[in-house]
Amino acid sequence: MAFPQPRPQAPQLPQHLWRTVDCQQGAVRAVRFNADGNYLLTCGSDKSLKLWSVSRGTLLKTYSGHGYEVLDADGSYDNSQLCSCSSDKTVILWDVASGQVTRKLRGHAGKVNCVQFNEEATVMLSGSIDGTVRCWDTRSRRMEPIQILDESQDGISSLKVSEHELLTGSVDGRVRRYDLRMGQLQVDYIGSPITCVCFSRDGQCTLSSSLDSTVRLLDKSTGEMLGEYSGHVNKGYKLDCCLTDKDTHVLSCSEDGHVYYWDLVEGSLTLKLPVGKAVVQSLSFHPTEPRLLTSMEGRVQVWGAEPEDAAENES
């Protein structure tokens, strides 16, 4: 006789506040998990980049070298390097251990909104209000980009790299997907200025948020709209969106002090997580666990799917 299949467990959503970190670096413009989720990066309006332990909420290192507020950052897969970008028009490559600037790259004509390593951390990609994405070789000493992508009609607000693909979101209302290996470009017209883009974890879809207070899920290869998610407020700020670690839910920051969770398939609002009374500007989802980082004003919140003492007892 056949045993009935076990029912799949309902996905766990981070909704229990584990800790709040007072970052003491002005407004936190972006918060990011590192590649393995053990550390977090905060980008401050006071020109600093900070590295923290997620489990303890303790400050490990401060990186100083930008001339104006830091807007985005990323960590290399082996945790040896960081990259960051700033309103000072520069991109900086950092040595994690020493805290020293390895390279400071100039070339953008305006503030740099977003930066990310490729998978091997051999290339940094930066997107700017000047409408270009610049690709920088992290291993060479040359100060010029190895490639400039200038198809956007307005500023680049967000970019994500996955293997040989690059996804960009622009104020011109378009999501662009570059196949860097094949030299191909696919453009999806959304219409409203894009604030954030990302790939789904399975690589089949793209997610974008825009200033019409809507998050959209598109089929990556066809551009077909698979889902629209709304209810949050995104009218004046560059806010983050993302998918959970298992692609079951769509998340977005909101200007009303909440993080919104929608069921990816149903499109229905699953959870409206109260963070505080101000704008939730940035979020980051753990690569493998149901954990979430949010930033509001000068603080970062770490959220888990269950109360922290219960999680510690299990581990």
UniProtKB/Swiss-Prot annotation:
UniProtKB keywords: Cytoplasm, Repeat, WD repeat
Keyword Cytoplasm: yes
GO biological process entries: mRNA splicing, via spliceosome
Major location (coarse): cytoplasm
UniProt subcellular location: Cytoplasm
Each WD repeat, start to end: 23-62, 65-104, 107-146, 151-188, 189-228, 233-272, 275-313
DNA damage among keywords: no
One Gene Ontology cellular component: catalytic step 2 spliceosome
SMART domains membership: WD40
Taxonomy, superkingdom: Eukaryota
Task performed by this protein: Molecular scaffold protein for various multimeric protein complexes. Acts as a module in the assembly of a multicomponent scaffold for the ERK pathway, linking ERK responses to specific agonists. Also involved in response to hypoxia by acting as a negative regulator of HIF1A/HIF-1-alpha.
PANTHER family attached to this UniProt entry: WD REPEAT DOMAIN-CONTAINING PROTEIN 83, WD40 REPEAT PROTEIN
Family: Belongs to the WD repeat MORG1 family.
Protein name, UniProt field: WD repeat domain-containing protein 83
Organism: Danio rerio (Zebrafish)
Chain's gene name: wdr83
